[in-house]
Every structure is written in structure tokens, then in C-alpha cells.
């Protein structure tokens, strides 16, 4: 069977859709991908790419058709807005390049929600089912990144988002709370809104010691964060909590930030302002396959989200990769993610509660190594039970192609 995958962000950008596409191909599907030109998260073209392409490539057996976009250079409100609106327009124009013959259309819908519009356009024209995998709920996620205060603009964002979600034949939510919200907003029957968690690639479950990294960060209690740095992660609060914990006795507690994003420069400036010194390291982005080297050296893994009720509807994909590593997870978040961390034996505090996060950091720091290892084992067991790649891929394929 043939499937068209629509996603603004794709290889060589580091998103889970890369592995989903590889999994579809491994399972015998004929896959084409309509995507953008790689410039996330810095807004700079990746090596070998420019506004002039290349527009046709292959990846792990899938055919790639790239559409232009205005890069999000500088990650200002203006450039992010232009990036959000430009790619769907260019992608819609690029639909005529697709060879056709698809049995279904699948959208990996991170931000912006507008990226599903070309998928809707193609599916309706060719009368094939369209499934939208909702990773970022809009317009709520937009407000966590850009301060949209104008009431008319907020009304437009809400109306457009609801309209796009309604036009999908099927929706996939990451959690039951998100499923209920999507059903309420679209009026779709429950059978057309599936709950399928984000899995992680199998390599996250394999320890990967890196002697150089371990030597560099030896003698510290390494609290590791991996992924994108945006206002939605509230990492400024995390940094303050780490410094509070160090002042309370956790003197070698070390925050290791592995990743990049629109908040990195502001966080670095805050670290200087607070005289954080060796309490924090900004390591920068690494390929996904390199992340296990950092989770292996970690004493604990950190996940955080800002205090937004709508962010609490989702479970970040990185949580699965953290649990797969078999290390204690410490979380500052609300809702579905908070509950998953608690169920798996991790330490969770409400979003943006700096004092509570500080206390959890101190509790984990003071915990005997054997007890921390036991927490990590519980985390790994939860991953095995809920986030295995093969099962979740099978469910994605079945629901997208057959609605089952």
C-alpha cells in the first residue's frame, strides 16, 4: 500500500517522524514524504541545503519531495510567523509534483497546525482518508511560544485550528485527556480519535558509554535535559531550582542541557546574570543517535513544561526515551505527563513550582545510589509496558490505513 506523509520537519532535522517513516518502509509500505527544507531550530539552512533545494531526495527507502519555506532565522516573532505560514503555501503548490496513487495521507502535526492544510487539500481532491497525528494542540501551543494578546488574532487562530482538525477524517491523540479535548472541539465520534502514545527509537534503550563525556563530567551529579529549548519548557525556572538546590547542600548538582532552540540565548544570559558558573553546561545539539551517550552518564533525567493547562494534555515524546534509558526521571509539569512520571516511579512536581522542584532535586540527590537505581528500573519497566516501538508503529499503520 502507498502512503503520503506530510510534515514540515523531516530528516536531517531531528524529529520522530524520521523513524516512523523508516518503520513504515520496513513494514512494506510505499512511502512518499512532503516536507520542508531543513532549518530547525536555529533558522539556518543545514549544510548542503539552501532556498534552492535540493527538492528531491530519498531517505531509508522513502521518496522525499521538499517544498520551500521562509527560514525562522533568529527565532523572532516575525520570522517564526513567516515560517509558519510560508511552508503550507509552498507545500500546497508542490502537491502537483507528487506521483499519486496513495491509499492514505498521514500528517505528523507538530507546530504549526497549518502544516496539515496541504494534506487536507490532497486527501479531499483524491478522495482518500486523511489521518492527523496531533503532537502540538493549537492554538494553545502557539500561545506558549508567541505572546498573542490581540483578541481578534486569537479568535482567528482558534477558528482556523478547529476548522483544520474537523476536516481530518481521523485524529490521533497522545493521551486520553487530549482525545477528549479533540472530540469536544471537532464533534467526531470516539472511534475516529485514537489514543496512541509517542514511542521512541529502540536505540534509546541501549546503554552507550562515552569515555570522553564521562571523563568531562565526572565527579558531578548530572541532571540531563535533552531536546528543544523554548518558553514552553520553563528552563529558566529549572535553572533557578538547580541553583537553589546547590545552595541547600547539593553542591555538585550539575544541569547539562543537550539541545538548542529559541530560548537558548536567553538562558545563557540568565546563567551569567545568576553567576551559575559550572552549575550548568550548554552542550548544544547532537544527532538523535548520540543522545544515549548523555542519558547513560546521567544521574537523573529532567523533563519540564510551563504552567499551561493545555500543555498538560500531551505527553512529550522525550519521556519515552528517558524511561527507555532506565534512569530516574524528575519532572516539573502538569496533567498527563505528570501522571505518567508518577506511575513510573519518577519524581514529579507541578509545573513552574520552583520550590517543589528544588525539594525533589534534593531528595533525589540525597537518595542512596541503590534506591536511585531502583527508580531507574521502574522507569524502564514502564517503557517496556507502554512505549515499545513495534506495537505503537503497528497501531499507527492500522489506524491510518484502515481506521482500526
What would you call each of these model-derived segments?
Residues 1-57:
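N-terminal subdomain of nucleotide-sugar transferases
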Residues 37, 177, 196-199:
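Carbohydrate-associated surface elements
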Residues 29, 183-184, 191-192, 199-215, ...:
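Acidic anion/phosphate-binding donor-loop and adjacent secondary structure
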Residues 343, 347-355, 363-369:
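Conserved acidic donor-binding segment of nucleotide-sugar-dependent glycosyltransferases
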Amino acid at each position: 500500500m502507498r502512503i503520503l506523509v506530510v510534515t514540515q520537519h523531516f530528516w536531517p532535522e531531528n524529529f520522530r517522524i524520521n523513524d516512523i517513516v523508516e518503520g513504515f518502509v520496513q513494514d512494506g509500505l510505499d512511502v512518499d514524504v512532503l516536507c520542508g527544507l531543513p532549518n530547525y531550530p536555529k533558522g539556518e539552512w543545514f549544510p548542503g541545503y539552501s532556498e534552492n533545494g535540493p527538492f528531491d531526495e530519498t531517505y531509508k527507502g522513502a521518496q522525499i519531495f521538499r517544498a520551500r519555506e521562509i527560514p525562522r532565522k533568529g527565532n523572532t516573532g516575525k520570522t517564526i510567523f513567516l515560517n509558519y505560514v510560508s511552508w503550507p503555501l509552498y507545500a500546497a503548490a508542490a502537491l502537483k509534483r507528487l506521483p499519486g496513487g496513495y491509499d492514505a495521507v498521514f500528517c505528523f502535526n507538530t507546530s504549526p497546525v497549518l502544516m496539515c492544510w496541504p494534506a487536507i487539500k490532497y486527501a479531499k481532491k483524491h478522495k482518500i482518508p486523511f489521518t492527523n497525528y496531533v503532537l502540538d494542540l493549537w492554538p494553545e501551543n502557539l500561545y506558549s511560544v508567541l505572546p498573542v494578546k490581540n483578541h481578534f488574532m486569537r479568535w482567528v487562530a482558534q477558528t482556523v485550528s478547529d476548522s483544520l482538525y474537523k476536516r481530518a477524517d481521523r485524529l490521533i491523540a497522545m493521551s486520553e485527556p487530549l482525545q477528549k479535548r479533540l472530540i469536544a472541539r471537532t464533534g467526531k465520534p470516539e472511534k475516529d480519535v485514537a489514543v496512541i502514545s509517542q514511542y521512541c527509537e529502540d536505540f534509546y534503550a541501549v546503554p552507550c558509554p562515552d569515555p570522553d563525556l564521562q571523563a568531562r563530567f565526572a565527579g558531578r551529579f548530572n541532571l540531563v535535559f535533552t531536546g528543544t529549548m523554548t518558553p514552553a519548557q520553563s528552563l529558566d525556572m529549572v535553572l533557578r531550582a538547580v541553583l537553589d538546590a546547590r545552595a541547600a547542600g547539593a553542591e555538585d548538582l550539575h544541569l547539562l542541557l543537550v539541545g538548542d532552540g529559541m530560548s537558548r540565548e536567553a538562558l545563557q544570559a540568565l546563567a551569567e546574570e545568576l553567576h551559575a558558573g559550572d552549575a550548568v553546561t550548554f552542550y548544544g545539539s547532537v544527532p538523535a543517535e548520540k543522545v544515549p551517550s548523555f542519558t547513560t552518564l546521567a544521574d537523573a533525567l529532567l523533563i519540564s513544561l510551563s504552567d499551561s493547562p493545555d500543555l498538560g494534555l500531551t505527553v512529550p515524546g522525550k519521556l519515552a526515551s528517558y524511561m527507555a534509558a532506565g534512569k530516574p526521571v524528575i519532572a516539573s509539569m502538569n496533567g498527563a505527563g505528570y501522571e505518567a512520571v508518577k506511575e513510573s516511579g519518577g519524581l514529579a512536581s507541578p509545573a513552574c513550582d520552583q520550590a517543589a522542584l528544588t525539594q525533589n532535586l534534593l531528595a533525589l540527590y540525597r537518595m542512596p545510589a541503590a534506591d536511585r537505581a531502583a527508580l531507574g528500573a521502574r522507569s524502564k519497566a514502564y517503557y517496556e509496558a507502554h512505549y515499545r516501538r513495534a506495537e505503537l508503529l503497528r497501531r499507527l499503520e492500522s489506524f491510518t490505513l484502515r481506521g482500526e
